[in-house]
Amino acid sequence: MTAQAHLDRIQTINQGSFYTPDSITRLVYQMLLNAKIDIKDYVLLDSSCGYGSFLNLEGFKQNIGADIDKQALQKAQKIFKDYAIAPLFLHTNSLQNVSREKFNILESSKLIIVGNPPYNDKTSIVQNHLKSIDSNPVDSQLKARDIGISFLRSFDILKADYICVLHPLSYLIKESNFKSLKNFIKHYHLLDSTIISSQIFCPKSLGFFPIVIALYERDNQGMDFDFICNYEFKTLE
């Protein structure tokens, strides 16, 4: 999949925009298959789809991609234009007025959310001079210091049956971040995981940090911080 090329440095920082190599999307797909999920019965949603890397995944009832970045969506549409069944693309702010209806998903549909949602701590001093606090509106119940946490909260509102996404490992292992996930951790538990390095996405960065490919399943028990403290995370061989 083509790397993101149309955003300047400030836009990239504000949107947390890094696009996902095929090797990572294959790991996500394999994680879903290993969980023995009958994917043909599920709608697949990537609510921050960029160029559509995760929409290449096959075998789902329908593939839907949404993004606030119109240029990225236009590129994605060109990439998929010759597909017999192309994904449904939606140009929208996925953190505003969040509902299944917004994404053309029935309340009765089984739903899997995948992707590499933006992550960007807007209160961090790192490159703070380039960050815009109010770059895009966010529903009040989703507002957080890091936009990636906002996305995870939005997945709970959408009541996805399974979620397989990339996000900083610190969302789970740092207790303050974990608690800031709010209702997400009440309704989901970690089913599988693989840790990778942020170097994959930003090799010229001033510093690297661990990212987890995390598979979550919705249930009535959720998870607490003790569960995470005792969880054995896997790494790439």
Locate each region found by the language model.
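Glycine-rich phosphate-binding loop signature in dinucleotide/nucleotide-binding domains
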Residues: A35-I39, N104-S109
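Mobile active-site "lid"/loop adjacent to the S-adenosyl-L-methionine
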Residues: N120-A144
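Conserved Class I SAM-dependent methyltransferase catalytic core
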Residues: Q141-I200, A214
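S-adenosyl-L-methionine
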Residues: K78-E107
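Flexible, glycine-/basic-rich loop-and-beta segments that form/coincide
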Residues: F208-E237
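Short catalytic/ligand-binding loop motif for oxyanion handling, primarily in non-cytosolic enzymes
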Residues: F54-L55, N120-S124, Y171-S176, M223-D224
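Internal, well-ordered alpha/beta segment that forms a basic, Gly-enriched binding/recognition surface
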Residues: I112-Q127, S154-F155, C164
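Class I S-adenosyl-L-methionine
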Residues: M1-Q77, V98
